[in-house]
Amino acid sequence: MSIRVDEDLKYPADLECVRLAHRFPITGDRCMASRRKNRKRPLWHPAFWGAWILVFILWLLSFLPMGIKQSFGRWLGRLLSRRMRSRARVADANLAACMPELDEATRSQLVEDAFVASARGVLESVHAWWRNMTPYCESASVYGVEHLEEAKRRGKGVLLIGGHYSIFDFALPLIACKLEKPGYMYRPNNNPVIDRMIEHGRRRHFGIRPFTKRQIRPMLSFLKEGGQVWFACDQDFGKKSEVFVPFFGISAGCITSPSFIARESGVAVICVSHLRMPDGSYRVVFSPIQESFGEHPEQDAKVWNGFIEATVREQPDQYLWLHKRFKSRPEGAAAIY
């Protein structure tokens, strides 16, 4: 049987994909088949038994009362700050660059506090994946809902630009309960068992619809139909960083995807923050609609970076300082790590 080869298929791997497609037809969105395994391991494969044990442990932890979760998170965070030295050095480097006014002792304490906040955030996420979130949705302090109403009056969907604060999955239902048609952008976990656990836990609440970076077109359609999508885009994506804008006065690599999404879908863009307050309560803040968002990607990045910075300055331990936020550097700039 002859195989027609398009001119666009110029590489051997692409040609092999065509041959495999004729010999072994498959369904689904598959490409570059020669670079993938012929079949995925089933979730009960022995390679995933460790992940299943972890899921079982997390499920058991979800039954702990929230007060005990918070106390355990404090103990666990302090322990990890001493054991995970490489991540502690990353957090220290981030804080030294962003808050040079802090002395060494204060910065060291803030590193430990960031570990504690992150550990508590994991346990809060476990609660959100398996337990009832209604009491927290009802008791959380929420500000700026009128901006969501304004977007609705304009007949627009909403792109909610967020950040990686310590309450992350726990915050998803707190945000979604204020939305009529919620969705979110996410990066699938490399371990399929862990990914299934996380996604199942997220989708329990309010019919939230997930989108990956490979589902941009469906997400644009969802937004055009009045959907409201949460996108935490404040991490350093390495070579995918397209612009550099100030974050705490340091040039930070940013993607321009939010600008593209806003421009193509015509949505209203609103920044959102979600914090655990010192008294143990939770707070969600929606910003006013960011007018003209999507026209100038660099300016857009400055807007959402500025919003995140203002939030972090209020509760500095609540940010994910353990992430290498300044991994990408502008040409000629000194490395931070």
Please give the residue ranges for each predicted region.
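Intrinsic, low-complexity polybasic segments
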Residues: V18-R19
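Catalytic core of membrane glycerolipid acyltransferases/transacylases, capturing the structured
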Residues: R154-K213, D236-P246
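Non-catalytic C-terminal accessory region of glycerolipid acyltransferases
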Residues: G28-D29, A33-H45, R74-L76, L80, ...
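Membrane-anchoring hydrophobic helices of lipid-metabolizing enzymes
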Residues: P12, G28-G162, D195-E199
